[in-house]
Amino acid sequence: MKNITARNQPAMHKISRMSYNEAFCSRSVEKQLEEYIAFFKEDFAFVLKKLEERFNGPVVAEGNQLLPSLVFPHLQPGHKAIWMIPAERFQRHHYSKRSWIKDILDCTDDPAAAFDNWMTRDARFAEYVEQEAKALNLGVLKVDGSQDLQATIDEIEEYFGPAQG
């Protein structure tokens, strides 16, 4: 975050200076989502630079900055990408179990409302990513907890096919 400026990365600059209360309570979920997506679009250039510096060839990467519309132009012919999209119920359940979430929520005026806004925003973000990926004919795997980890791994391996070597 030290290399961002209000001029070049306005969303990153704005969000990086918000309190948790501002981030999750004082703005509508729609505004949160709009600014969240703008943040990730700005951050994508930094992520891409790091990936290009470290890897020459296929890469496995994760992060909200890797929006399908931003990744797509960088895929070489024959390369594939898949987005694992959490179901809202799955995400709410697992986020509520993370100890650091409580620390963040305790910094807000209304922890229950903040959590609900956060999870609603994230559910809408998941829908946004899923729609982008499908529009570009990129892979999507919905994660809802209905299959175990090995089944998820198997599904991803099947999507990518046999390793090239």
Where on the chain are the PLM-derived regions?
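NTP-dependent small-molecule kinase module
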Residues: R124-G165
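Short catalytic-loop micro-motif centered on adjacent basic/acidic residues
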Residues: E34-E35, V59-A61, V140-V143
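Conformational switch/transducer regions in large eukaryotic molecular machines and scaffolds
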Residues: D43-E52, S69, L136, L141-K142, ...
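Short, hinge-like loop/turn segments at secondary-structure boundaries
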Residues: A6-R17, G78-H79, I101, Y159-F160
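ATP-dependent NMP and nucleoside kinases share a basic, alpha-helical "lid"
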Residues: E52-F55, V59-T108
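Alpha-helix-centered segments that form part of catalytic cores
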Residues: K31-V47, A113-Q131
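Conserved nucleotide-sensing/catalytic segment adjacent to the nucleotide-binding pocket
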Residues: K2-P58
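A solvent-exposed, charged loop/short amphipathic helix patch at secondary-structure junctions
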Residues: S16-K31, R98-F115
